[in-house]
């Protein structure tokens, strides 16, 4: 079983990243791929959960041990699979997620894809006491995977550009220019600027 991978990010896609470890590329599913950046110089550490099925082995990656622990707690709830757990962890507000579980806020949990009221209630019942251990064991710093990645607003804008039909390479081409923009920009601001850059 893998505990973590330390290597270079050689590919970033809407659903996964590729971590090159000594010339071997590992495809790793992560909640927010665009929090990572392709970099052939600076290695990053990605914590790993390995899911083994009869027909496939899937690696799920996390920026911190705390995020990985929360993931394993979520998939331990009946009705929550790895993909649903990743979708939940895609929210940038992990503290808000934990608060919702502790406070019994099923409306907050029901907003995630594939999570109905019954499943939200199960999450609360089964994890209300367990998520405290995540806070006690590891400082909550879910959003810093090695080198600093783009903001949540920029991540959303990059994902939106791909959903509009632009290729990963096209989006990556304008990403650094968008990161250099000054001021606090919204997703729409980044999207508008990105479209202008791509139209050149």
From Swiss-Prot:
Belongs to the RuvA family. One of its GO terms (molecular function) is four-way junction helicase activity. Keywords: Cytoplasm, DNA damage, DNA recombination, DNA repair, DNA-binding. Residues 151-200 are annotated as: Domain III. It comes from Limosilactobacillus fermentum (strain NBRC 3956 / LMG 18251) (Lactobacillus fermentum). This is Holliday junction branch migration complex subunit RuvA. GO terms for biological process: DNA recombination; DNA repair. Homotetramer. Forms an RuvA(8)-RuvB(12)-Holliday junction (HJ) complex. HJ DNA is sandwiched between 2 RuvA tetramers; dsDNA enters through RuvA and exits via RuvB. An RuvB hexamer assembles on each DNA strand where it exits the tetramer. Each RuvB hexamer is contacted by two RuvA subunits (via domain III) on 2 adjacent RuvB subunits; this complex drives branch migration. In the full resolvosome a probable DNA-RuvA(4)-RuvB(12)-RuvC(2) complex forms which resolves the HJ.
């Amino acid at each position: 079983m893998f505990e973590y991978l330390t290597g270079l990010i050689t590919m970033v896609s809407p659903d996964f990243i590729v971590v090159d470890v000594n010339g071997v590329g590992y495809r790793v599913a992560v909640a927010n791929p665009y929090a990572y950046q392709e970099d052939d110089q600076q290695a990053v550490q990605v914590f790993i959960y390995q899911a083994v099925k009869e027909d496939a082995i899937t690696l799920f990656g996390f920026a911190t041990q705390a995020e990985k622990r929360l993931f394993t707690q979520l998939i331990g709830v009946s009705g929550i699979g790895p993909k649903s757990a990743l979708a939940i962890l895609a929210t940038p507000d992990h503290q808000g997620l934990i608060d919702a579980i502790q406070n019994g806020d099923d409306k907050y949990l029901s907003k995630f894809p594939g999570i109905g009221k019954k499943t939200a209630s199960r999450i609360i019942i089964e994890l209300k006491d367990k998520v405290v251990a995540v806070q006690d064991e590891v400082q909550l710093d879910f959003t810093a995977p090695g080198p600093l990645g783009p903001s949540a607003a920029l991540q959303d804008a990059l994902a939106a550009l791909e959903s509009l039909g632009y290729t990963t390479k096209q989006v990556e081409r304008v990403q650094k220019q968008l990161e250099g923009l000054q001021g606090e920009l919204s997703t729409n601001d980044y999207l508008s600027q990105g479209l202008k850059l791509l139209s050149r």
